[in-house]
Amino acid sequence: MKIKSMIMVVIMMLCITINAQEQSNKTLVAYFSATGTTEKAAKLIVEVTGGTLYEIQPKKEYVTADLDWHNKSSRSSVEMSNAKLRPTLKSKPENLADYDIIYIGFPIWWNSAPRIINTFIESDNFAGKVIIPFATSGGSSISNAEKELRETYPDMKWQKGQLLNGATKEDIKKWTKK
């Protein structure tokens, strides 16, 4: 009888543990990185949070000439000069509905998020999800990009974003615990 009781207790504890794991928040770390800088930050966030990494990719990859912000005819300059322009995505993440928390990372372009971030956000239903932006930049802060995203998508559950230039794993741990 004692053995049966012990087995029942073990089975119940196992069921409780499995149920708790299923109810925990699932995290997606989605990022766009034209040069690899934002990708490094995204990978650190995945290490710290245990989230799933997803690269936001344009259907047509950016080449160096596309990123020349001094050239008004470059692809990035043209995209950023038109707030309604939406570059096509190569793919969409599978099972977005399974995620509760979504980090969205990007380089700052013209003091804003690149237009492909708008494409990504508009490609699926983010209702009820916690959205946490992060960015990298050669000289701008994330504040204007974050403000624009909040204003453009007011129904999303935005959390405070973070600029992660040269961030370490410890920096990410401190930020994600806030």
Mark where each language-model region is:
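Active-site-proximal beta-strand/loop segments in catalytic clefts of secreted hydrolases
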Residues: 32-34, 56-59, 105-108, 134-137, ...
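Bacterial Sec-dependent N-terminal signal peptides
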Residues: 1-23
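N-terminal beta1-alpha1-beta2 submodule of the flavodoxin-like/Rossmannoid cofactor-binding fold
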Residues: 20-100, 111-113, 170-177
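Helix-loop-strand module that forms the ligand-binding subsite of alpha/beta enzymes
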Residues: 70-154
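Glycine-rich phosphate/pyrophosphate-binding loop and the adjoining helix
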Residues: 157-178
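Secondary-structure boundary/capping positions in well-ordered alpha/beta enzyme cores
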Residues: 52, 127, 156-159
